[in-house]
């Protein structure tokens, strides 16, 4: 997997190495961020990238931001447009993509701070895994998930992913 040339920060295309978040931000320190990870599938017959269930992902992205009571929201239509711009800027062609949209508290403060909010979008080539054709083994874990009344598990919040 090669490193892309560009990422998107707050709607601006920036060089990959300049896509940074301050270490004192609440998003970095406390995981006060929400995200959607989605896939782009290259169709060689049509020479086009197809984004998998983008509308559904963006609905959940908006819901997650509202649930976290962020001071401002990045709406799905805007994030979709910025994602397409990023894909075009990187000139991705021929490979499937893993795309990550993240809204995060970019300001400093404690765990309860709700703004200001930043937006990052990254897209990286991710070829289809051999496991798709070869299969995998799985098991049921004995670990219990954190209950919804302890943390907002219905939201794709970065902090939730420390809990399995």
Predicted regions and their residues:
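Helix-start/capping segments and mature chain N-termini
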Residues: 1-71, 81-85, 110-164
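Short, glycine/charge-rich beta-strand/loop segments that flank catalytic centers
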Residues: 75-86, 94-109
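Cytochrome P450 catalytic-domain "roof"
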Residues: 91
């Amino acid at each position: 997997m090669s490193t892309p040339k560009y990422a998107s920060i707050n709607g601006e295309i920036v060089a990959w190495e300049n896509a940074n978040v301050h270490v004192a931000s609440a998003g970095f320190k406390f995981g006060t961020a929400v995200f959607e990870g989605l896939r782009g599938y290259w169709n060689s017959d049509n020479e086009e990238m197809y984004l998998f269930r983008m509308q559904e992902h963006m609905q959940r992205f908006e819901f997650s931001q509202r649930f976290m009571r962020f001071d401002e929201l990045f709406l799905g239509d805007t994030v979709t447009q910025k994602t397409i711009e990023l894909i075009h800027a990187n000139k991705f062609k021929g490979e499937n993509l893993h795309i990550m949209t993240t809204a995060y508290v970019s300001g400093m403060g404690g765990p309860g701070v709700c703004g200001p909010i930043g937006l990052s979008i990254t897209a990286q080539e991710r070829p289809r895994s051999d496991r798709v054709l070869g299969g995998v083994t799985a098991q049921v874990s004995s670990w219990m998930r954190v209950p919804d009344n302890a943390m907002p598990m219905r939201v794709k919040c970065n902090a939730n992913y420390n809990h399995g």
